[in-house]
Amino acid sequence: MKKILYKTNLGKYYLGNSEDLLRNKLNKDLKGKVQLIFTSPPFPLNQKKKYGNLKGNVYKEWFISLAEIYSELLTDNGSIVIELGNAWEPERPVQSLLPLESLLGFVNNPNAGLRLCQQFVCYNPARLPSPAQWVTVNRIRTTDSYTNVWWMSKTDYPKADNSKVLRPYSKSMKNLLKRQSYNAGKRPSQHHISEKSFLADHGGSIMPNVLEFESIDKTKEARIPENIFSISNSRSTDYFLQRCKEEGYNPHPARMQPELVSFFIEFLTEPGDLVLDPFAGSNTTGHCAEITKRKWVSIEMEKEYGMQSIFRFEDPSLRSLLKVGF
């Protein structure tokens, strides 16, 4: 029997091994119906974490095997987005190639039929200095402050619309639009810029694939798309952390940035589409999908993380019809 910990009108949170569930009991329900699989699998860390992580070739083989499971769940124009952190060789100040080898194996899995649509880099200044031995003790490496985010699909043209994730114009661009003139002509790059190339107001500028939800340059504001900012700036995260404290839970140590989840949900799906997270943890993905009126399915092995994820949906501001225990 499928173990549903809780559900809302839009989604369900399952407890169990995601590979087993998606190969068997959930396969029929989800096959060909998922528009976006967004997840952050356990990273190949050298120290064992409570939320689970494998090492070396065992990790790589396991990671590659996920591709064929996920691929058959997608709609014809669906997407897989995976956040994958960096790894280091044990007891050496040398970065491991394991994440890249795993990613290449995943994309090239002959039973999955995937291709890499685009690579993103997510800058996170809140990450602790790591690996600590080489960054803070010996001081021979710099802080690892980003993760790679890989967007894949079964088609060259998955559903996507970057006009839904435009970021606010910079002050200089706003001034240019107001002034309706700029220095046109030939550039050192040999590109010729016409007098009207940049005078149309499209409501914002196209996001780059380096995602700054906090600005790298502290003298400049982080220009987050307004619809993403409104989700990430809600009081829901504060509510979640407060409830964890009140109920004696230690919050999941590797919680997903809501801005990151929301960006890809807005970019790659529409209201009513189905979003899946096979490694849901405290269910940031399901929470962001709920806010944006997407259907969602989340799966997690650790009951403790499932229990604390309930707090996200008990937030009165969300107004979800939550049902717990089946």
Language model segments and positions:
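Core catalytic lobe of class I
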Residues: 2-308, 321
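Conserved phosphoryl-transfer catalytic core
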Residues: 305, 314-326
